[in-house]
A protein has these predicted regions:
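ABC ATP-binding cassette signature C-motif
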Residues: 1-259, 308, 317-515
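Post-kinase regulatory C-tail/linker adjacent to protein kinase catalytic domains
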Residues: 312-314
Length: 515
């Protein structure tokens, strides 16, 4: 059974073609991974099929009465809702049924016997709907999912006051409670710690309905999907199997195209040579015209221009003193403490990975060390000659700056050619670097922020989830560059596959936190 059918879908943005003549079909029970480089249109595709964006051309048809659950990168939570309110909203349609049922009960005393018989049938149907959907177990369902997602202690807190990562976990929990006919998940693991990624992995492995998943976490992707749709060069192509099988088939397909292109180019050369040599001679003119017609009708094979590959290299400043920083009975938090007194020390050459569940204070610790947040108590002492490069987990762009503008603000003495070259080394095309930051994808924005740090002379890197939104190729290049970096590294990451080869020491925030 087809749940979603897409025919001849085309869409552009700001004069740039994103998707062209795309055809797509989703069948019941399919577990699809939607993959491709940053900025190629994966999130745009989901926004089009859900109606958040209106397609310029093409047809999108959903099966009747299908319920869609969509977790995107920019979901919004109401300002006055507690976490429990957000999770309860997953059952809003059942609360509407309950309200309708209560209205029926209120009317019963005013009805004739015949009207009462009719309305009792309606009431029985509504009551059955509530019981079938476990309406009277909603609170226990909320408690169960909150426990599994590690958010139980937040249930009565205002959702708007939580961090971006915490809110993402809440929205994911709400989506799973809704149990839609299809899940659309846009990078759901970005803000999940290892424990809850594993829980989500098991959940999706056993999920009976269909889902479409965008993820740059390849080990996670491979463990839950059975089909790949690859988005690149305005096309969406289908591959059966996991991500590793997709890479093998894609490479095989590319070699076949290149071989066919080479063969066709040779044929074209031979035909053109024949036409040139024989079109003027009366005896061979007809044969030359025949060859020319063949050339004119030939469907030319075009090799797709290869996208620029990322080339990351961190500029370095002279070495620091032996001590980088040391804390004495440091307590971090905002209005109240969230950590035990911390006595931490980082020295030259240390490469420290900060791990642990969301909401324990990893980002707060980094911001306190950097002086962006005042400590509750305790002190921090620093070494000499520190040149720190800081990568924030998220950045919001309210102005009309392009990537070129962002780089110029950081490096005002640079010529435009140098700026464009630096951005190109982060695999950003001319279209990307001339677009406004606020319209770029999360991955493209991350590459611009990374480009600033790459070209800043540093001897300490403080990186808060730098792999969020990065495509696999960029992630691997970043890992390589960090392994070669000569300075100290203070890295927050939830991706064990990423930080294991980089870190010389691992600090688990659960050992430090009061939460």
């Amino acid at each position: 059974m087809s749940i979603l059918t897409v025919k001849n879908l085309s869409h552009s943005f700001g004069g740039r073609q994103i998707l062209k003549d795309v055809n797509f079909r989703l069948l019941k029970g399919e577990h699809i991974g939607l993959v491709g480089p940053n900025g190629e249109g994966k999130s745009t595709f989901l926004n089009l099929v859900t109606g958040k964006l209106e397609a310029e051309e093409g047809n999108i048809e959903w099966a009747k009465r299908v319920r869609i659950g969509y977790l995107d990168q920019h979901s919004i939570i109401g300002a006055d809702m507690t976490v429990r309110d957000v999770l309860k909203s997953a059952f809003s349609y059942l609360f509407e049924v309950e309200s309708e049922l209560n209205d029926i009960y209120m009317k019963m005393g005013e009805l004739s016997d015949q009207e009462l018989d009719d309305i009792m049938l309606d009431a029985a149907e509504l009551q059955e709907l509530l019981e079938t959907n476990d309406f009277y177990m909603i609170d226990s369902k909320i408690d169960e999912i909150a426990h599994n997602m590690g958010i139980k202690e937040w249930l009565d807190r205002p959702a708007f006051d939580l961090s971006g990562g915490q809110r993402s976990k809440i929205l994911l929990a709400k989506l799973l409670l809704e149990k839609p006919d299809i899940l659309l998940l846009d990078e759901p693991t970005n803000y999940l710690d290892e424990e809850h990624i594993n829980w989500l992995r098991r959940y999706l492995q056993n999920y009976e309905n269909a889902f479409i998943l965008i993820s740059h976490d390849i080990s996670f992707l491979n463990s839950v999907i059975n089909l790949i749709y690859h988005v690149e060069n305005c096309e969406v192509n289908r591959y059966v199997g996991d991500y590793d099988e997709f890479l093998r088939l894609k490479e095989l397909k590319q070699r076949q195209i290149e071989a066919a292109y080479k063969k066709q180019q040779q044929e074209i050369q031979e035909l053109e040579d024949f036409v040139q040599r024989n079109k003027a001679r009366v005896a061979t003119r007809n044969m030359a015209m025949s060859r020319q017609k063949k050339l004119d009708k030939m469907e030319k094979i075009e090799l797709v221009r290869e996208k620029p590959k990322p080339e990351f290299y961190f500029e370095t400043a002279p070495s620091t003193s032996r001590l980088i920083f040391e804390t004495e009975n440091l307590v971090i938090g905002y209005d109240k403490p969230i950590s035990k007194p911390l006595n931490l020390r980082m020295e030259r050459g240390d490469r420290i990975a900060i791990v642990g569940a969301n909401g324990l204070g990893k980002t707060t610790l980094v911001n306190t060390i950097l002086g962006n947040i005042k400590a509750i108590s305790g002190s921090i002492s620093f070494g000499q000659n520190l040149a720190i490069g800081y990568f924030k987990q998220e950045e919001h762009y309210d102005n009309n700056n392009t990537p070129i503008d962002e780089m110029w603000e950081k490096f005002p003495s640079w010529e435009q050619f140098k700026i464009r070259t630096a951005l190109a080394k982060c695999s950003l095309t001319t279209v990307h670097i001339e677009s406004q930051m606020k319209v770029l994808s999360g991955g493209e924005q991350a590459k611009v922020r990374l480009c600033k740090i790459l070209n800043e002379k540093t001897n300490i890197l403080m990186l808060d989830e730098p792999t969020n939104h990065l495509d696999p190729e960029s992630k691997e290049e970043l890992k390589r560059a960090l392994k070669e970096y000569k300075g100290g590294i203070f890295l927050i990451s939830h991706e064990k596959d990423f930080y294991t080869d980089i870190a010389t020491e691992i600090w688990n925030m659960e050992d430090f936190s009061l939460l």
